[in-house]
């Protein structure tokens, strides 16, 4: 390629990197508010299933997990991951709260529940009790 062609492409890339709509840089996130506020111990019925609500703050202030007793599984969102935990470095996160939520709420569930995080592979609470380096 000719030097001028390369320079022109570099300038185009530079301009695109400055555009937040193209480069996927986080824009300021506007707050939003829940339509319904759930509390620890609430029951939610959806699609013929009954979920128990566990208040599991830490990743967010109002974080909850949903326990499906009949299937021995829990939907943990971004609280717990396979061998990891959710981020707490945002202004609304708390490392102390997320550790407490995992140890005192999730790990308090009796039995080997399957834990489904918001993303990434599923795990089990027994595996995380034994091997998660963040909550030993």
What does each of the following model-derived ranges do?
Residues 14-18:
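Short, charged, surface-exposed secondary-structure boundary motifs
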Residues 36-39:
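Short acidic-hydrophobic, aromatic-tinged amphipathic segments that line or gate anion-handling sites
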Residues 1-13:
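Single conserved hydrophobic/aromatic residue that forms the stacking wall/gate
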Residues 1-4, 48, 107-108:
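Structural motif
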Residues 19-22, 26, 43, 50-55, ...:
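Metallo-beta-lactamase
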């Amino acid at each position: 390629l000719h030097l001028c062609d390369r320079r022109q492409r570099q300038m185009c890339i530079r301009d695109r990197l400055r555009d937040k709509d193209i480069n996927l840089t986080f824009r300021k996130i506007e707050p939003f508010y829940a339509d319904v506020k759930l509390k620890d111990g609430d029951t939610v019925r959806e699609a013929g299933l009954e979920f128990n609500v566990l208040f599991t703050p830490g990743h967010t202030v109002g974080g909850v997990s949903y326990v499906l007793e009949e299937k021995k599984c829990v939907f943990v969102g971004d609280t717990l991951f396979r061998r990891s935990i959710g981020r707490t470095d945002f202004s609304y996160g708390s490392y102390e709260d997320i550790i407490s939520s995992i140890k005192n709420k999730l790990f308090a569930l009796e039995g080997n529940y399957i834990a489904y995080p918001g993303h990434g592979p599923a795990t089990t609470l027994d595996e995380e009790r034994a091997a998660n380096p963040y909550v030993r």
